[in-house]
Amino acid sequence: MNNAPDGAELLRVAQKVLREHLLPGIAENHRYQALMVANAMAIAARELKAGETDLHQELRMLTQLYGDTMVGESGNSVKDKVASLNKRLAKDIRSGVLDGACAQGVRALLKAQVKARLRISNPKYLKAVGLE
């Protein structure tokens, strides 16, 4: 049994040490860079915590829109499938293929994608605007 902290936890601890113990002693001309490092560590920790869960959810939503396209293809990772379907989605949005009956589903998908990305990159914003 492995009781060691995982990568996300290690990043959170390192970020806390940086912010609480090291940052106060850093020269003013290096504070901005240190804060950027701390923020990058927080984003990386949230990405690790989310793992592939967000990707699987995004794939599920894309396959609801397009059917089981690519789901059974061997050799493609979930990440590759999501990337390919998102390219198709962008092309279809630009061409107007998804206007009409699909428009509501496309809006829901795009909103979910943006929320998932904001949960990782800027979760405080989601709370500030009442989306979480």
Locate each region found by the language model.
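An acidic intrinsically disordered interaction segment
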Residues: M1-K16
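Short, charged early-sequence alpha-helical segments and their helix-coil boundaries
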Residues: E47-Q64
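Charge-dense, low-complexity intrinsically disordered segments
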Residues: M1, P5, R31, N76
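C-terminal amphipathic alpha-helical interaction region
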Residues: L10, A14, H21, L59-E132
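N-terminal interaction modules that seed assembly of large macromolecular complexes
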Residues: K16-E52
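Secondary-structure capping and boundary motifs in well-ordered enzyme cores
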Residues: D6, L10, Q33-M36, K81
